[in-house]
């Protein structure tokens, strides 16, 4: 049996988890932190991990503001009615005004989007959903994360978050192990997501 090693990864940003949130956070971290060292660790493989791994047939919220289909105010009104008034309207508005740009980014990355043959707009299923061929959704977003990260570690099970000794109630690092080799990994980044 080979000797177990300890890998210490120094980085500016450590992203724990390679699902849609983690791969998206890795992409955004690079966008906003061009000169930072960014590392992402995932317990499986970022190409097919997380809830979106099996694929989707629709994106459940798209405003279509460029075609004047819906506006953020419309979505806030819908959410307020649907949730019987229990809604943070400011957060709903903020999400709604940014969601189209995320969808356009997925389109640029190559996510197959169904389109209305007459208008060329995205094909709708209901007021808010647009239809996609989403079998490749997660691998497409994972590819963006791979291009954005300095290093991706697959098969790393993070077992403990380390508390920052200098700031109370702040996570300062993470430790885990490679599920295939048994090697330990530790990281004390400037920021952990």
Can you name each region flagged by the protein language model?
Residues 13-40:
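N-terminal Rossmann-like FAD-binding beta1-loop-alpha1 element of flavoenzymes
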Residues 24, 28, 50-51, 192:
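Hydrophobic/aromatic ligand-binding patch that stacks against planar heteroaromatic rings
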Residues 2-18:
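N-terminal/domain-start segments enriched in small and hydrophobic, helix-friendly residues
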Residues 20, 175, 186-187:
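Mobile, glycine-rich extracellular loop/lid and propeptide segments
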Residues 8-11, 180-191:
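Core beta-strand elements of the Rossmann-like FAD/NAD(P) dinucleotide-binding domain
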Residues 14, 44, 192:
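Anionic group-transfer/hydrolysis microenvironments
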